[in-house]
From Swiss-Prot:
GO molecular function terms noted in the UniProt entry: DNA binding; DNA-binding transcription factor activity
Native source species: Escherichia coli (strain K12)
Role according to the record: Belongs to an operon involved in alkylphosphonate uptake and C-P lyase. Exact function not known. By similarity could be a transcriptional regulator.
Pfam families: GntR, UTRA
SMART domains to which the protein is assigned, alphabetical: HTH_GNTR, UTRA
Chain's gene name: phnF
HTH gntR-type domain location: 11-78
GO biological process: organic phosphonate transport
Protein name (database record): Probable transcriptional regulator PhnF
Record-linked CDD domains: WHTH_GntR (cd07377)
Higher taxonomy: Bacteria, Pseudomonadati, Pseudomonadota, Gammaproteobacteria, Enterobacterales
Length: 241
């Protein structure tokens, strides 16, 4: 029997480095982290920068990392786990995983409710609702855009003061109102141009569209309806049965 000794039958040095780095990415890195500088990695593996770059190219092609001009190599893998239950809290959940979540307000207005917002909140189309839009980041990386809708206009003076951090924590601290998730619907679609700009992602990237109803304890009508556009590569939802 003839056994091929062609060089391509064996992993090249850059393929070996890529495999080693991929293993380390799985075990030690989180989405939003950066790899050590190119010079450090080349010295560690005792190769020239050209070989090291070919190894990084393989990780880029597989979607593990992304090159950021002038910044470094950004880790994209290992999506965060997010449990979908009545008590789920975005900020606390990510803090428990050793990450640094932040949230900033992009918009706060009173506007007439569209048909789907009115249906979700159980009100008449055209009635005014409070509309807040927030951008959430994890370790500095944009994760999701969220549109929040509230039917109770007495909350408007309070919600106007919200600027950053956890919206639900702010609402509880300012008003004593605690919200509980009562329904979640998840679908998928491609990101549109403005969404790509806000989320700092390539055109047509996959997004998870998460529609959520939140209730106050003891009340039948929803207090909040939210629509979250979340990067599909950065999060995994877990549902216990």
């Amino acid at each position: 029997m003839h056994l091929s000794t062609h060089p391509t039958s064996y992993p090249t040095r850059y393929q070996e480095i890529a495999a080693k780095l991929e293993q380390e990415l799985r075990q030690h890195y989180r989405c939003g982290d950066y790899l050590p500088a190119e010079q450090q990695l080349a010295a560690r593996f005792e190769v020239n920068r050209h070989t090291l770059r070919r190894a990084i190219d393989q990780l880029v092609e597989k979607g593990w990392v992304q090159r950021r001009q002038g910044v470094g190599v950004l880790v994209l893998m290992r999506p965060f786990d997010y449990p979908l239950n009545a008590q789920a809290r975005f900020s606390q959940n990510l803090l428990d995983q050793g990450s640094h979540p932040t949230s900033e307000k992009l918009l706060s207005v009173l506007r007439p409710a569209s048909g789907h917002v009115a249906d979700a909140l159980g009100i008449t189309e055209g009635e005014n609702v409070i509309h807040l839009r927030t951008l959430r980041r994890v370790n500095g990386v944009a994760l999701c855009l969220i549109d929040h809708y509230f039917a109770d206009l007495t909350l408007w003076p309070t919600l106007q003061r919200f600027d950053s951090g956890s919206l639900h924590d702010f609402l509880r601290e300012q008003t004593g109102i605690a919200l509980r998730r009562s329904q979640t619907r998840i679908s998928a679609r491609r990101a549109q141009a403005k969404e790509c700009q806000r989320l700092e992602i390539p055109n047509m990237s996959p997004l998870l569209c998460v529609r959520t109803l939140n209730h106050r304890d003891g009340e039948s009508s929803p207090a909040e309806y939210s629509v979250s556009l979340t990067r599909a590569d950065m999060i995994e939802f877990t549902m216990e049965h």
